[in-house]
From Swiss-Prot:
Molecular function in Gene Ontology: hydrolase activity
UniProt keyword annotations, A-Z: Hydrolase
Family: Belongs to the UPF0173 family.
Domain of life: Bacteria
Official protein name in the record: UPF0173 metal-dependent hydrolase BCAH187_A4741
Gene3D superfamilies the UniProt entry points to: Ribonuclease Z/Hydroxyacylglutathione hydrolase-like
One Pfam family hit: Lactamase_B_2
UniProt cross-references to InterPro entries, sorted A to Z: Metallo-B-lactamas, RibonucZ/Hydroxyglut_hydro, UPF0173, UPF0173_UPF0282_UlaG_hydrolase
Length: 227
């Protein structure tokens, strides 16, 4: 399994001949190395409905005939835009032909904001994502605060790599993310959701230096690890 980071919260997984992308915020993302028109994908996994996570989902899904796996309300909202979806909810899991997906808790918000019409559409609860294939598990925490049930994620799952937000302001900051890493018990921890905007500027190298009992790895956009 090849796992690549592409800036902000964009993660690409290549496994068993399939390509899965999590939270494909590409257009307007100053930290990504990808262009939406160049991306080939079989499945898109979404943690929540904010624009910096849904990103180019509709375009990518339609162009590639890819299924979008998302929390129920967000999946329904996207299905109304002509996208093929598979709705799920927190605590539920499903075996797809590309791997197993399970949604976990996340403490954040989830909505579609229409700036032009000044409306906000509720898109369900935010989530973290556990993805398992080839006997390897990736945990993408989505946007979240620190919460004590991260201990359960670590106890119930053998997490090979965890992507944790460290940007602060909208999510947990580096200090809380260090504790999250301890609780999740991942073998490798990769920081995400930082330095995309001024308000979430952080030093990822300082973060990984504080990690204990795991390997911290800063991935630049386009870099990957093999599990």
């Amino acid at each position: 399994m090849k796992v690549s980071y592409h800036g902000h919260s964009v993660v690409k997984i290549e496994t068993n001949g399939k390509v899965i992308v999590i939270d494909p915020f590409l257009t307007g993302n100053p930290k990504t190395d990808l262009k939406a028109e160049d991306v080939k994908v079989d499945a898109i996994l979404l943690s929540h409905g904010h624009g910096d996570h849904v990103g180019d989902t509709v375009e990518l899904a339609k162009k590639n005939n890819a299924v979008v796996v998302a929390p129920f309300e967000l999946a329904t909202f996207l299905s109304w835009q002509g996208v093929k979806t598979h709705p799920m909810h927190i605590g539920g899991s499903h075996e797809f032909d590309f791997g197993k997906v399970k949604f976990t808790q996340a403490f954040h918000g989830s909505s579609y904001i229409d700036e032009e019409n000044k409306t906000i559409t509720y898109t369900g609860m935010p989530a973290g994502i556990l993805f398992t294939a080839e006997e390897k598990t990736v945990y993408h925490a989505g946007d979240t605060a620190l919460f004590s049930d991260m201990k359960l994620i670590g106890e119930l799952n053998n997490v090979d790599v965890a992507f944790l937000p460290i940007g602060d302001n909208f999510t947990m900051g580096p200090e809380d993310a260090v504790l999250a890493a301890k609780w999740v018990q991942a073998k490798t921890v990769v920081p995400m959701h930082y330095n995309t905007f001024p308000v979430i500027e952080q030093d990822p190298y300082q973060f990984v230096e504080k990690l204990q009992n795991c390997t911290g790895k800063v991935l630049e956009a386009g870099e990957s690890i093999t599990l």
